[in-house]
């Protein structure tokens, strides 16, 4: 029987300056065993009994060194099928707003980063679910859609 798992989170980190929002994208190191060299948003696995929110906050700190100013639960759950485990992974999405003056400190998983437009960030993603999710963050969270006020997580 196929399992359904939820041990992975994805986080879109963005800043706002001068009325423009920018998204953080990072390139995975070429020697990473999983998806080497691709551009991605923050993607990480939960540890122990941590909640998805706790894992998302930890991953933001570990992968970027940034401290979120605000956080939202994005009204989107990504998914993929893992053939090796015969499992469907359900991935909750989060968005965090960071201080535009803060310095990014990459983990060893990544070799470069850039702050870019939402459209460009989506075009860099290898996976259609990530492209779709980035659009939802732009429309609902950054764009002030109805979900923004309903899904903000107090920090």
Annotated model-derived regions:
Residues 1-24:
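Conserved N-terminal beta-strand and adjoining loop/helix that marks the start
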Residues 40, 88, 115:
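Short aromatic/basic micro-patch
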Residues 19-20, 101-104:
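Short helix-loop capping/hinge motifs at secondary-structure junctions, enriched
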Residues 61, 65-102:
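Active-site segment of metal-dependent pyrophosphate-handling enzymes
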Residues 20-62:
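Conserved Nudix-box catalytic region and its N-terminal flanking loop in Nudix hydrolases
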Residues 126-155:
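Charged phosphate-binding loop/patch that engages nucleotide di/tri-phosphates or the phosphate backbone
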């Amino acid at each position: 029987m196929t399992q359904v798992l939820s041990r992975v989170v994805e986080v879109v980190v963005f800043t706002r300056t001068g009325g423009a929002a920018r998204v953080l994208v990072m390139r995975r190191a070429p020697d990473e065993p999983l998806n080497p060299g691709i551009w991605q948003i923050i993607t990480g696995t939960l540890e122990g009994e941590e909640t998805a929110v706790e894992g998302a906050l930890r991953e933001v700190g570990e992968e970027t060194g940034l401290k979120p100013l605000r956080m939202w639960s994005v009204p989107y759950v990504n998914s993929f099928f893992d053939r090796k485990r015969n499992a469907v992974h359900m991935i909750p999405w989060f968005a965090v707003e960071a201080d535009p003056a803060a310095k990014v400190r990459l983990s060893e998983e990544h070799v470069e980063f850039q702050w870019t437009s939402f459209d460009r960030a989506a075009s860099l993603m290898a996976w259609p679910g990530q492209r779709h999710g980035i659009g939802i963050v732009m429309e609902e969270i950054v764009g002030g859609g109805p979900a923004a006020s309903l899904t903000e997580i107090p920090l």
